[in-house]
């Protein structure tokens, strides 16, 4: 039996479909209602919450493999407590539940946000991106946003489990791209292109196809004895303008053409912060999202490609696939509502 958390999320929904296609029995956790995903009727759904330690221990009965994909992604200041509870405490509960049942293998979906960073002054002075891989160390003295900190602390919980005998492997994907809800996760970038906005922020973004994340996660967890290691997953880095431009072209829409200068982005996030404090509404842009991509970073994936003998899909191919899928979904919804 394979147990999956985060089945309603981008990685979880594709992972469950892949596990079912392989003929594996799947048990998955849900909170409020069973997510409407492909193969949902072939899954044993268990109502619960990763913050419920006792409930998780019961859910792992007869389980041989656990895929922990659940997590909260947010840069809003009001979500700091939730990030701690879901990402850190939730992962600690998963680890403890696995340790209660010796022999379980855990595949944990972390993030490149948990890698830490290095200064890379020479590279930056030469106009080159700073390169990071699995050996990157977390700088305890540096300023980190709440999301990155939560993923780092969550990963520490997995390393704790490993030190106590847990067989676990960790993947650190960059921004995962795939066709999902228009209003969730990275798909909002594609929605931005579809809506024909005029402005874009200069900078780069590291991307990886959700299909590659799922395939590599499954192979590392199910098909290898590897334990106590982490693997960076990223197809490459592209300018945000190019990503939005390609998506707009796939949708047959006009791409954004006006770059937002840094000073304007700095002003906007401050105004949004004040508005959020006064109204309680979530900010449309935060300090972290305003500054994302300014510092050029590139993630090296030599380790996973050598280990699995597998390369990543090109970003352009992923964008084209996502846009085609999203257009098909949109047309289907239009037909159903007409």
Residue ranges and their predicted role:
Residues 29-34, 50:
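N-terminal Rossmann-fold cofactor-binding loop
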Residues 216-284, 301, 306, 311-338:
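Mid/C-terminal beta-alpha module of Rossmann-like enzyme folds, strongest
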Residues 43-89, 97:
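NAD(P)H-binding glycine-rich loop region in Rossmannoid oxidoreductase-like domains
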